[in-house]
Amino acid sequence: METLISYKNSYSDFKQSYQVQLEHAKGQLKYGIRYGENYRLPLDEKKVVFYLSNNDQRMECLLKVMEAFVKFNLDQEYTIKVIFGAKLDKNLIPKAFQKYIEHPSDAEAQEDLATAQYLLSGESLPKYFVRKEGQNVIRFFDEFHKEENNRLELAQNKLSWLINSTFVFTEDAKSAEYLSDNPYFMELQGKVEQFSEDIIRSKEEIIDHILNRKIEDVKFDKEHILIFVSAWKDEELEERYLRLITDNMNYDQKDVILVMKRPEDGYKEDIVQHLNEHVRIIYRQGTFPCSAAEYIDVQYLLKNFDSFEDVEKAYGHLNTQVIQRETKRLFGDRLFHDVIYIGAHSALWTILAGCVEAKNRLRIQYTDLVIDDQEAITEAKKRAFSNRMELYQLAFDKIVFPNLRYKEQAIEREYVKAEKACYFEFPTKINLENDKKYENISYLGNQYFIGSRFEYEYGGVRLDLFPIPEEGKLKYITNAEICDESELLEMFTKMQEKDSQLVLYGETAAKIRETAKQFGVEDQLLLIEKERLDLSDQMEKYLDSFDGYLYAGNESSYCPIRAGMELLGKDIFVMEDGIIKKDEKKQFKDERSFEEFRMKKWDDFL
């Protein structure tokens, strides 16, 4: 590979340094490279590998199959290997198989995993394993029940291992039913059956039912959506976008997989745990299954994309076969309709997302690129910023901004090409089938009025939703901050005879609602935050849905809600001497005087 950068890091220096590191590599990295060195070798149609990990303490059905191999002398017709966890009791293995045992760390073990036509395993597979085309991977489970396999546990390789399975045997009917019928596992692995000893009554039945089992393609009835969450930088913002996307999918038509690093703390884990129950979660663990030379080439590019002089040329040097082998390790052979990337910059995760086979690849760019550019104060940081923008446009079909302004300034400053940029507003329902158009949604089953669009400095756009009282009831609103609490509640309690609801506006609204429990009307009170309604450019349209405005006490200060209700011709109600009546006094004599005041004090209430 030619040198691609003008900085001190040359490819030859990098390669020499990395070769030394890889020579001393241990654990999964070492085994993954050994496996990768053998990955291109052809499958041996007469090789059978039994893989028992340290977790397979009682895998009776798998052991019975091994015993049957001995009984019918299948070990004389097939090349048999047993990769055996170091912590397992070797007495579990039939004596005739003792001579075939290999330790997972043996070099021969990685070659056998890469070349075996048949791989029979228990609960686990190696983290670096990728099922090759034509390779028959048959799994045996003693139990696989929901209570023992929550989705965070499944995320730790188990889901990927299922995806790389062509057939699954379970020891009990409950597990077979759970894997076959549970929506979380549908369209993942191959066929599932409860293990029956009938299949090992003769040599012919073993060969026909296990060794010569036809590999059936998993049928996909839904469109697959893949979401990448890279390094967590702004947890609140990333969680918001993650929920925005996952809460508004039609899971009758969409199958959603979220892939991410394993959370480093309980807060992030809690975010993931409480996502929509239909979302399948996979933690990327392990390493690239590739040779040492391939690994060095990939790492060189990943670590230097920020400093390359020609990003497009560097991107063209990527060994996409190795990257796609890694995505196959995680997701199997499934094709995705859409790939969505959320989170902070990561060259690795960008490349992974860019190499997944999909119709559409989207990057959610929720930060203000102008600010990001301004914060890049050194020459190296400016190059890194520029290179990242170019890398994103090579890897993704669209860069999605949270508002029109961010999109337009990104195009104007040439951060992003016009044909690569689009935007949506928050919150929305994503319709990936209709040219990335979005529509508003109901929240928790209730209807809300769409309030102001508020742009945060960090790039998010909040679309405020204001509660709408139930149809058929009289609808009132009040400014809770300038009302006498007890008088207001007494007034509203009397109005309950007319079956009404009241929206409370202001910082003290929650306190008043708590007090309302004494009057038994707390369920008829709805709340709006002061900031949200004050900043709304849709306030008058919202107020038009109400029948009247209530106030109690001294309301001498300006109230934009009352002013809006007056100008809309709505009734203003007061209570005097225990009697509720209309108030004919006006805060503004006409609309013009209100507009003049409004323009002068715009920032105070909008």
Q: What is each stretch, according to the model?
A:
Residues 151-167, 326-331, 379-399, 544:
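Membrane-proximal helix-turn-helix segments that form the acceptor-binding/catalytic region
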Residues 168-186, 395-420, 428-456:
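A short, active-site helix/loop in glycosyltransferases that binds the activated sugar's phosphate group
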